């Protein structure tokens, strides 16, 4: 469930899962504890690796570590995927968190995330069976449930970053402080394997970006939270301390899993424990030392060592001589009763164990690491009425409610209904629209069409009369009314910060576009901030975008919130409406390039206003290497993934509707109202099946103190 970017999880349940371990350690002390733990674990893994090498099992040692690590490695970076939200688009600390996340996903490249690098390592270790997406990994029966405990909770917390934002910053602080997990570091030190582990070091920057100290960035963000006071600091410390405890438990299990390669006894114990449940069904009548083998196998599901002890004394085994042992010779031959019960890898484990048995009394086994118990909270059976969320009654209310990220069930229904109504109007508009995508998709079709549209935009600008300039009042009013839209620039792509989408062939350019809109971690390049500076130049000082005061500002028309609400809804439904988002994104990125941005520049310069915003967009949205080109590439990547002509036709039509949805032509009723001088803004709202109210808004708290002080709580 937590892998779904559109899911909603109960914050109270997640809060119980985090638990309360008493007084948390302060960051300086916790940092020293992490350093000491890493040294201790480095020594432990070095001993285990040496034992594995002595048994000629270096590769098996690395494989055991990699297999258990797969669930966690598959979601690296996920704890930050839900932090960015429209209401905090201008918060400098949020921009730095997005910078950290960009390094984690390998912004600008497909399949360049830390998780994808781990999958490449799995290939080197001949473990491609495990090189899967997280949802597929969860279906593999041979992966222990406890391997999913930490990654599952990290995913779940990320879906409620409105409630756990400070805790997640603490989680990030601790993970960057650890850097490279000790078990993974041990994999990189094995001779003869040449495994490159640098990309798994969470403190290391992505080579495709400017060098940066991710640890220092995370520490800077943590300091901004500490400045907010004791309550926020306590939540930060809770997240950091919880993560360190959870990571120690995960690491102990990882270490214990690696011991299978350090000793034939450990490997055999693991094998018997894995196969015991199935075997218990078939051996009721076979006795070993007067007891049914089925009963021995039943006990072995929890403790396999007693079974190994009696098995070593049975007639099935000749200690020190696997070639004469019935268990791995006649019983598993084509005519034997256990033919094909064991895989070839299983048989190798059994043979090594048999040959090793004479040394059992003189060989010291590496001890397993103890695992601290962690109480799990019970899942709530019902949700309170307050948890159902809001069904906004006006566009202004919808704009305010949707400034967060998570959507409660009722609000989710509203968002789905709003988008569906908008798209239905766009579908009707498409029948007569003159600004359509080609009727059919094909390779190279979209890029050629894109260049043609760019030429048309440029020609329209060249043909325009430079002397025809709107009045200063018109320019100022237009800039003001665009504020609800432009101050959430990129909101339609919000869902593509999901770690899986952000690094996919379809989504990587969309995430890069989103990251560009927010300034690439640099406050001075943040598009909403640049636009707000332009508003100040025109003597408009607007409230923070995420505040109720902004949504209720009487200077802003109700009509000015229609398209922004569509963007806000669309961005929270990246899976349900992916084709439409792809089409709308292309329409948006292409809308001003070559033409209207140049016209806007002319008008703004004429009256002495800054042209920074339109200048920036006219360059980064270009059709060759900019956002418009990336938008077309994302569509092509999506269409190439489809496998049948029917799918191509259906999905392309959805993309075309999405393109039209940026500016669908008004219907007859809307046109009539406009001729009468009446507003139709409220008419776009879907009507609820029943009234729904909630006292809570799932908004994100600003991290930077200056931003927090500017924000007015509802």
How should each PLM-predicted stretch be described?
Residues 149-152, 213-224, 326, 596-598:
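Extended amphipathic alpha-helical scaffold segments
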Residues 199-218, 298, 302-309, 596, ...:
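C-terminal hydrophobic structural anchor segments
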Residues 25-204, 245, 252-273, 436-606, ...:
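Active-site-proximal alpha-helical scaffolds that flank and shape metal-associated catalytic sites
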Residues 1-46, 389-459:
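Extended, charge-enriched "interface" segments that sit outside catalytic cores
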Residues 1, 382-400, 693-714:
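Terminal accessory/targeting
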Residues 253-394:
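Aromatic- and Gly/Pro-enriched helix-to-coil junctions and flexible linker segments
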Residues 97, 169, 233-240, 343, ...:
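Hydrophobic packing residues in well-ordered alpha-helices of helical domains and bundles
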Residues 206-266, 620-711:
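Acidic, carboxylate-rich catalytic segments that either coordinate divalent cations
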